[in-house]
């Protein structure tokens, strides 16, 4: 570890976040199968804004204000929602130029938990290089939070976290004290 290096850590479940929480760190949210991949897809398809909201009540209030809403719980699309949380729902024809409020079982909850961090970054395999480039230019430590499934470990989120950590460590600007990385 050099003086100019930044620390990178991985939180394998939101349930463990309180043990790692660091308001001066940049927190990377990872929910590979749904939330973060869907948000990346939405921006690739021209959405003007995605607002991650932790509760269904909040999502419904955005619906009443005229926003499109993508919302699910336990994999079921909510009755009031325009569509669910699959990246395949975020097509250019559906969302280009629109504002979307987005609420999911796991991913948007993780975003909400990290809201007081220095910066919250949404990451998936779709934007891995862009996330690496962004974090490499920042001076803060990085905490990668796997959204998991209902507070439990998620293999796909962990796989992505490993890929990002590998890039960060190989770039030379980061170190880790964690023996599981």
Task: Briefly describe each language-model feature range.
Residues 26-38:
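Active/ligand-binding-proximal structured segments within catalytic/core domains
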Residues 8-9, 25-28, 48-51, 66-70, ...:
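Structural motif
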Residues 147-157:
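Phosphate/ribose-phosphate-bearing ligand recognition and processing surfaces
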Residues 82-119, 133, 138, 155-181:
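Long, charged alpha-helical interface segments
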């Amino acid at each position: 570890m050099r003086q100019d290096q930044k620390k990178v850590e991985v939180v394998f479940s939101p349930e463990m976040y309180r043990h790692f929480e660091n308001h001066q760190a940049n927190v990377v949210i990872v929910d590979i199968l749904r939330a973060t991949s869907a948000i990346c897809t939405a921006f690739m398809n021209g959405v003007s804004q995605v607002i991650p909201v932790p509760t269904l009540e909040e999502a419904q209030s955005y619906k009443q204000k005229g926003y499109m809403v993508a919302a699910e719980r336990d994999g079921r699309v909510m009755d009031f929602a325009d569509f669910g949380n699959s990246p395949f729902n975020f097509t250019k024809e559906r969302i280009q130029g629109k504002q979307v409020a987005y609420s999911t079982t796991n991913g948007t909850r993780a975003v909400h938990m990290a809201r007081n961090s220095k910066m919250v970054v949404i990451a998936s395999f779709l934007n891995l290089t862009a996330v690496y480039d962004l974090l490499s230019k920042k001076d803060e430590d990085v905490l990668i939070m796997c959204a998991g499934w209902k507070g439990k470990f998620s293999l796909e989120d962990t796989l992505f976290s490993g890929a990002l950590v590998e890039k960060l460590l190989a770039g030379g600007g980061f170190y880790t004290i964690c023996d599981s990385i």
